[in-house]
Structures are given as structure tokens and as C-alpha cells.
């Protein structure tokens, strides 16, 4: 459809505007920002940002009731919804591959410490900033809410139980390097998984999933990057919103306290 083509153009324009690729092309960051804005203006700009776009995969009722050809507010382009087992993205294969061992998963994708440390505190400051109030003795407390939304860490509660991943854990296969399917980093993947799926071979429960090709949040971030390069953080060209406005809206949606 037209909106998908416009979204792909936005992706390509941002890459083409980069100094790495811009030689021999007339595309610049202003053009890339305009291409992204064309997509976003169709949903009302920043006001059209989905309130649940940061955890679309957890909107289980919405996914289960999704009609053929329909898309949730966050999703610009998606594949077919199914609960079949023939695709890694579908049925309960993602959950079987990535749940911790005590939840009958294979623990394959393990987020890194670098990724965990990239999440700021709930005030928006990096954990290395003295203003962040980061507590090294309680490293997961008062963090960006998206950390708990996307990553299972030591002490996380998931599917009604506490997950223990620390190296001293005994009698628990979720601990660091305990068995071949245990985490190698101290973390397990949570993003994209449905908590109501059950890979237990004695009580398997598959749920509907659908692959996502383009989310509106991606286009918002495309705009923010290009607009910042073209007009600065609070410039907006001919549009009603700036890079600052977009990033603030995304952080507000996540529950990060406004610090500026």
C-alpha cells in the first residue's frame, strides 16, 4: 500500500542522507525528515503515537482478536497472524527457544550487560551520571521501565515465579552457566515473547503471533534523527514537531521522568 511504500522511502532516505552513503546523491537530512514526516502526519504526528507501542507484543487481547488485514495502532506493516508452529516467529516457538530452562525454554537469546547498562534510571539519566541515583547494590531498582519490560534479570518475576540468574544460585537451572541451555550473560530475552504461552510438553499452549516488518516507532525515530541533523533538536522545518518533541513523547510513554 501507499503508506508502506512511504515508510520504506523513509528508511532509505535516512540511510542515503548519511555521510557514509550520501556521495553522489541529492538526498540530505532535511529530505529524510520530510519523508518520515509524510508517514507520521497521516496519523496526526506525535499525537498519533500509540500509548502501548513500546510493548505491542504484550497486548494479547488485541493480538488474539485481530481481524485479517487489520493492524494495531503501533504497527505499520505486519505479516499474517497465526498460531501455527511452522515458523520461528509463530505458535510458541519463540517462547520454547527463549524462555528460561525452568519454564521449559532453551534460553537461546541472552541480552548482554552492555545492553542492560544502556537503560537509564527512571529519571532519564544514564547510570554513570551522578544525578541518576543509580544504586550499584540494587542495580535494577528505579530503572527505565522498559528494562523490566524487555529483559528478564535476576529477581524478575515471570509467569508467576521469581527467576534467579545469579552465579550463586543452586538447584536452579536458570542460573548463570548452570546447564547447556542456561543464560551465558545473566539475562534472558523477554521482548516479543507471550507470557501466556507454555512450552511445557505436558501442557503445551500455543498463542497467536504475527511478524512485524515496520513499526511507527521506527519512523518516529527516523524523523528524530533526520530532523536533529537538519534543524537541530528543537527545529521542525515545516512540521509541527521537532526531534525533541518525538524523543520526549517516547520517553514519556515509557514512564521516564522528564528531566529537561
Regions found by a protein language model. Give the residues of each.
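Acidic/polar-rich alpha-helix caps and helix-coil junctions
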Residues: 1-95, 101-113, 117-260
Amino acid at each position: 500500500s501507499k503508506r508502506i511504500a512511504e515508510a520504506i522511502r523513509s528508511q532509505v532516505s535516512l540511510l542515503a542522507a548519511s555521510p557514509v552513503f550520501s556521495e553522489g546523491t541529492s538526498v540530505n537530512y532535511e529530505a529524510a525528515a520530510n519523508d518520515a514526516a509524510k508517514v507520521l502526519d497521516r496519523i496526526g504526528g506525535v499525537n498519533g503515537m500509540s500509548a502501548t507501542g513500546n510493548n505491542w507484543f504484550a497486548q494479547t487481547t488485541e493480538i488474539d482478536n485481530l481481524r485479517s488485514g487489520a493492524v494495531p495502532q503501533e504497527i505499520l506493516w505486519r505479516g499474517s497472524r497465526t498460531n501455527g508452529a511452522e515458523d520461528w516467529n509463530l505458535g510458541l516457538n519463540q517462547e520454547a527457544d527463549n524462555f528460561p530452562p525452568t519454564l521449559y525454554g532453551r534460553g537461546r537469546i541472552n541480552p548482554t550487560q552492555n545492553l542492560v547498562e544502556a537503560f537509564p534510571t527512571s529519571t532519564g539519566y544514564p547510570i554513570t551520571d551522578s544525578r541518576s541515583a543509580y544504586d550499584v547494590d540494587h542495580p535494577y531498582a528505579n530503572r527505565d521501565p522498559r528494562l523490566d519490560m524487555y529483559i528478564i534479570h535476576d529477581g524478575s518475576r515471570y509467569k508467576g515465579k521469581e527467576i534467579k540468574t545469579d552465579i550463586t544460585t543452586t538447584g536452579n537451572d536458570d542460573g548463570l552457566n548452570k546447564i547447556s541451555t542456561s543464560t551465558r550473560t545473566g539475562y534472558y530475552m523477554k521482548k516479543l515473547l507471550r507470557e501466556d504461552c507454555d512450552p511445557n510438553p505436558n501442557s503445551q499452549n500455543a498463542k497467536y503471533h504475527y511478524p512485524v516488518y515496520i513499526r511507527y516507532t521506527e519512523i518516529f525515530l527516523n524523523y528524530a534523527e533526520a530532523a536533529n541533523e537538519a534543524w537541530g533538536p528543537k527545529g521542525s522545518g515545516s512540521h509541527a514537531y521537532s526531534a525533541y518533541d518525538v524523543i520526549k513523547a517516547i520517553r514519556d510513554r515509557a514512564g521516564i521522568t522528564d528531566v529537561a
